[in-house]
Amino acid sequence: MWKEFKEFAMRGNVVDLAVGVIIGGAFGKIVSSLVNDILMPLVGLLLGGVDFSGLSWKFGKAVVKYGMFIQTVVDFFIISFSIFVFVKVLNKLYWHNKKEEEIKDTAPTLTKEEELLMEIRDLLKQQRETR
């Protein structure tokens, strides 16, 4: 059982996924800091000095922190857009390289027989022209 798990865990896809999750988590922290520490204070300044993180409604003992929700939504959209742009660039590079490979692959490669047949055809044309 342990051997099977080890083989599964060391497969390329699982390791790649783990690296992606770790990098994604770090990227999320960077974007969260960008939103919380740079963008939201500027947006709050433009809207008259509003600090979104402190916005809330109180219903008795319950507190609804809708300001934090607004920050989280902005955070989500920035992360989503960043990932979208990153994937779009990667796909463009991937498909550009793929098209170049296809062009190389579609270049006609003649077999030995085809080359010989073309030589025979050319020789027959020359013989006809000389008569």
From Swiss-Prot:
One of its GO terms (molecular function) is mechanosensitive monoatomic ion channel activity. It is found in: Cell membrane. It comes from Geobacillus sp. (strain WCH70). This is Large-conductance mechanosensitive channel. PANTHER family: LARGE-CONDUCTANCE MECHANOSENSITIVE CHANNEL, MECHANOSENSITIVE CHANNEL MSCL. Belongs to the MscL family. The keyword Transmembrane helix applies. Homopentamer. One of its GO terms (cellular component) is plasma membrane. Pfam families: MscL. It is a multi-pass membrane protein. The chain crosses the membrane at residues 8-28, 30-50, 67-87. Keywords: Cell membrane, Ion channel, Ion transport, Membrane, Transmembrane, Transmembrane helix, Transport. PROSITE patterns: MSCL. Channel that opens in response to stretch forces in the membrane lipid bilayer. May participate in the regulation of osmotic pressure changes within the cell. InterPro entries: Mechanosensitive_channel_CS, MS_channel, MSC/AndL, MscL_channel.
